[in-house]
Regions:
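Short, well-ordered amphipathic alpha-helices
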Residues: 1-7
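Membrane-interfacial terminal anchoring regions of lipid-handling membrane enzymes
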Residues: 7-332
Length: 332
C-alpha cells in the first residue's frame, strides 16, 4: 500500500528493512536486547502494478500479483535467517553462544555486551565445521558440539552462562567489589521508596499478571499483555494512586508536621491556600512513582548479580573441574 501511494504521487518508492530482534531471554524481566537492521530491500516500479496505483488513487484496494509477493517473500527469507538465532534448538543456541565466550576468553577478551555476544556467536555458527546453511536450520553435530552443549548445560542448570566465565586459568570470574557502594545505595533507595513502589508499580504488576494469566495463546501473548499493563498502567493507575496518597497527606498533615517539625499550616506553602499544597503533593507523586520504579530495577539488578556471584562461589567442585576441561577442549 505504501509503495502504491508513493507511485501514485510520484514519490520515491519505500524500502523494506529486515529487522532482527535479539533477546537473551525474552520472557525475563530486565533481559538484554539488541535490535539489528539489515540492508534495505528496494521496491521497483515493476513490483507495483498500475491497477494497484489506480485503485489506491480511487480509495480502493486490489491484491498485488502472487508472483510479486512470492518474490519479496523469497528475498526476505534469504536475508532474515542470518539475523536470527538460526539454531535447531535452544540447547544448540546456548552451546554456540558459550563457544563464542570460550573463544574470546582464550584470546584474552570478554564479550561485554549482548550485541558483541550475538555477533560473535554468529561468526562461530557460520564457521562451524560441517555446518550447511539451510532453512529451517539443520542440527549441528559432532564431538565439538557435544562438548559445547555439555558445558552450556552445566551452566544453564544453575542459572549461569558464558558471561560468568573468568579469564583463562580461572573458571569463573570474581565479583567486582568496586560495585558494592553503588549496590548498597541502590538497595537503600529502593527500601526508602518501597511504599510508593508497592502502591503504584505493585498494582501494575498485578494487572499484568492477571492479564497474562487470562490468555492461553502462549508465552509471546502473555508477554504482550504484560507489556500493555506496563505501558498503559501508569496512565490508568497512577492518577488514582496519586489521589489516594494526596488524601492520605491531607488526613495526616498535622501528624506529618509534628514528625518533621513543620508548621501546622505547612500545606498552605506560604500562599494561604491548602489546595495549592495538595496540588503540589499530587503532582510530586508522579516523579516519585517513576523514581521508585527505577530504584526497583536497580535493586533487582543487584539481587540478580549477587545471586549469580553466590552461585559461582558455591559451584560444585566436580562439575567445575569438568567445565574447565570442556572449555579447554573447545578452544584446543
Amino acid at each position: 500500500a505504501a509503495a502504491a501511494l508513493a507511485k501514485a504521487n510520484d514519490l520515491p518508492l519505500p524500502h523494506l528493512v529486515p529487522v532482527g530482534l535479539h533477546f537473551r531471554r525474552r520472557e525475563l524481566f530486565r533481559t538484554d536486547q539488541y535490535i539489528e537492521f539489515g540492508e534495505p530491500i528496494p521496491l521497483t516500479d515493476d513490483m507495483v502494478p498500475d491497477d494497484m496505483v489506480a485503485a489506491v488513487k480511487a480509495g480502493e484496494w486490489v491484491e498485488p500479483p502472487a508472483e510479486i509477493v512470492h518474490r519479496i517473500r523469497d528475498e526476505l527469507q534469504t536475508r532474515l535467517p542470518p539475523m536470527t538465532p538460526e539454531a535447531a534448538t535452544w540447547a544448540e543456541h546456548r552451546a554456540v553462544h558459550l563457544t563464542a565466550h570460550a573463544e574470546a576468553r582464550a584470546e584474552g577478551r570478554s564479550l561485554a555486551t549482548w550485541q558483541e555476544e550475538v555477533l560473535a556467536a554468529r561468526k562461530v555458527r557460520d564457521a562451524w565445521p560441517g555446518r550447511i546453511a539451510s532453512f529451517p536450520p539443520e542440527p549441528i553435530t559432532g564431538s565439538r558440539f557435544d562438548r559445547a552443549n555439555e558445558a552450556a548445560e552445566l551452566l544453564e542448570q544453575r542459572g549461569l552462562d558464558g558471561r560468568d566465565l573468568g579469564p583463562r586459568g580461572r573458571v569463573f570470574r570474581k565479583a567486582n567489589l568496586s560495585h558494592l557502594p553503588s549496590a548498597i545505595a541502590s538497595v537503600a533507595l529502593f527500601l526508602t521508596l518501597l511504599p510508593f513502589s508497592i502502591t503504584s508499580l505493585g498494582l501494575q504488576i498485578t494487572l499484568g499478571r492477571l492479564l497474562g494469566d487470562s490468555t492461553d495463546e502462549g508465552l509471546d501473548a502473555r508477554t504482550s499483555f504484560q507489556f500493555l499493563a506496563a505501558f498503559f498502567g501508569s496512565l490508568l493507575i497512577w492518577p488514582v494512586v496519586a489521589a489516594l496518597w494526596t488524601a492520605g497527606v491531607w488526613f495526616t498533615h498535622d501528624r506529618l508536621a509534628s514528625l518533621f517539625g513543620w508548621g501546622s499550616n505547612w500545606l498552605e506553602m506560604g500562599v494561604g491556600s491548602t489546595l495549592v499544597g495538595l496540588t503540589v503533593v499530587y503532582l510530586l507523586c508522579f516523579p516519585v512513582f517513576w523514581a521508585s520504579g527505577k530504584s526497583f530495577a536497580a535493586a533487582w539488578d543487584v539481587w540478580v548479580d549477587s545471586k549469580k556471584a553466590w552461585t559461582r562461589s558455591r559451584f560444585p567442585k566436580a562439575e567445575k573441574a569438568r567445565l574447565e576441561r570442556l572449555l579447554d577442549e573447545l578452544v584446543s
